[in-house]
Amino acid sequence: MNRTVRMRWLKGMYLANVFISGPIGLANLVAPDVMRALMGVPPGDPVHFGLGAGAIPLAFGIVGALGLRLPGRMAPVLLIQALYKSLFLLGVILPQALRGSVLGFAIPLIVLFTLFILGNVIALPFSHLFARMPRQDLAEP
């Protein structure tokens, strides 16, 4: 993928975090009962608590704003996001699915997480993220 296309994907994923993850996280922190009612989530449900109660999505929204200015430097955050969403799907949703107990309100979350994972995997400059750093770079503050 050429550099221009990858940069557009990176910025697109940062925008998604600013306008989707950030507001969802903020709303979960400020008005959790309203968000539970909107999403149809019963209090104490593991899917809701698996979201990190809003702090994690809000953090990704804030970092997404930074990523629009510094796309390459913030790329590790998108890697972390892809990993945590993947682990959530594998560790929380998959076991529920295997038991046949995935609740209906989890479906939009599964779709959203899957789209973010795919978008991040497409956008991430893996060769840049995993490039070897010269030893002197490690010693600099």
Positions of predicted regions on the chain:
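Physicochemical signature of membrane-embedded alpha-helices that form the seven-helix bundle of GPCRs
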Residues: 13-16, 49-52, 76-83, 108-111
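Juxtamembrane loop-transmembrane helix junctions in multi-pass integral membrane proteins
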Residues: 1-8, 40-44, 48, 69-72, ...
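Membrane-helix boundary elements
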Residues: 4-47
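Membrane-helix boundary connector in multi-pass membrane proteins
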Residues: 90-108
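Structural signal for membrane-spanning alpha-helices in multi-pass inner-membrane proteins
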Residues: 28, 64-68, 92-96, 120-124
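Membrane-interfacial, low-structure loops and terminal tails that flank and connect transmembrane helices
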Residues: 1-7, 130-141
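Core segments of alpha-helical transmembrane spans in multipass integral membrane proteins
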Residues: 22-23, 45-69, 82-90
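Membrane-water interface at the C-terminal end of transmembrane alpha helices
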Residues: 107, 111-138
